[in-house]
Swiss-Prot record:
Its EC number is 2.4.2.18. It comes from Thiobacillus denitrificans (strain ATCC 25259 / T1). Binds 2 magnesium ions per monomer. It catalyses: N-(5-phospho-beta-D-ribosyl)anthranilate + diphosphate = 5-phospho-alpha-D-ribose 1-diphosphate + anthranilate. This is Anthranilate phosphoribosyltransferase.
């Protein structure tokens, strides 16, 4: 057992917290055994030192341990499209839109998310605007995924132990370990993942964290314009975990027949605008919004092992939108979640 004081001493000296020690420290935080000052000291110390793969993996293990489990029965092709947020791009909900497209193409989507971090509309905000009921039990979310191929887990409902750290995070107002733990702690434990990150340095780190956590097929992505998505603006840095091996490379929209475009055409200022842009994509309106969803949904389909290549995934995404299947998937989730609320 490591005390908060011992951990702080280690961090001030720029030394790593070992795996078992990090497990113990994180459990103390999750149980409410540390004071707000101690929590602030530890997470700030980790940030200043720079969190290692081992420290992040241990913290994620504990957060998963304390989360409510979503007991999905059919785990093959189960994928999450959750990102860190924090890129301040103010774009519409690309990964949420991509989730419906991927589900329509045969992936099973366990979408994990919350309210806005730095954008004007988080995944929960836009889904609520679309009529999705966020207050489902773990069993109801699992049933949704098994029945219609997609379910949404509103993060605060599944990570109750985070209440001990949440006020500290808000008051500190700077990025800490907890900003990157959310996408690593899917309550359905999805083995496939498309994870967008707010800084290029996190690509190599988080793909190796997911490797340690036992993920199957993962892409961690960061756009050259700073987006925590696969971008149309230029290159995207990719960290891919496949067949137990990690590779890092870049991709560009031109390689896949997509028109390069900056993020201005993707900006929204509230959940209503985000909803309208999401619906325009699902209605197959040509333009940058549809193209960036094709790019990201294609990647989600690929990492869910529903396509052999990213290019094939993009074509499957294109057909899912063109056929109306992606729009149908949204309507199915609205209907299923509303029915569950009334049950």
């Amino acid at each position: 057992m490591i005390t908060p004081q011992q951990a702080l001493t280690r961090l001030v000296e720029q030394r790593e917290i070992f795996h078992d020690e990090m497990l113990a420290l994180m459990r103390q935080i999750m149980r409410g055994e540390l004071t707000p000052v101690q929590i602030a000291g530890v997470i700030t110390g980790l940030r200043v030192k720079k969190e290692t793969v081992g420290e992040i993996a241990a913290a994620a293990e504990v957060m998963r341990e304390f989360a409510l489990e979503v007991p999905v029965q059919q785990r093959e092709h189960l994928v999450d499209t959750c990102g860190t947020g924090g890129d301040a791009a103010h774009t519409f909900n690309i990964s949420t839109t991509a989730a419906f497209v991927a589900a329509a193409a045969g992936a099973r989507v366990a979408k994990h998310g919350g309210r806005s971090v730095s954008s004007t509309s988080g995944s929960a905000d836009v889904l609520e605007a679309l009529g999705v009921n966020l207050a489902l039990t773990p069993e109801q979310v699992a049933a949704s995924i098994d029945a219609i191929g997609i379910g949404f887990m509103f993060a605060p409902n599944f990570h109750g132990a985070m209440r001990h750290a949440a006020p500290v995070r808000r008051e500190l107002g700077v990025r800490t370990l907890f900003n990157i733990l959310g996408p690593l702690t899917n309550p359905a434990n999805a083995p496939h993942q498309l994870l967008g990150v707010f800084h290029a340095d996190l690509v190599g780190i988080l793909v190796r964290v997911l490797q340690r956590l036992g993920s199957s097929h993962v892409m961690v992505v960061h756009g050259s314009d700073g987006m925590d998505e696969i971008t149309l603006a230029g290159d995207t840095l990719i960290g891919e975990l496949k067949d137990g091996e990690v590779s890092e490379y870049t991709i560009n929209p031109r390689e896949f027949g997509l028109q390069p475009c900056g993020s201005d055409a993707l900006k929204v200022w509230d959940a209503t605008q985000a909803k309208d842009m999401l619906l325009s994509v699902l209605d197959d309106l040509p333009g940058p919004a549809r193209d960036i969803v094709l790019f990201n949904a294609g990647a989600a389909i690929y990492v869910a092992d529903r396509a052999a290549t990213l290019g094939e995934g993009i074509e499957l995404a294109r057909e899912a939108i063109r056929s109306g299947a992606a729009r149908d998937k949204l309507q199915q989730l609205v209907a299923y979640s509303t029915q569950a609320k009334q049950a």
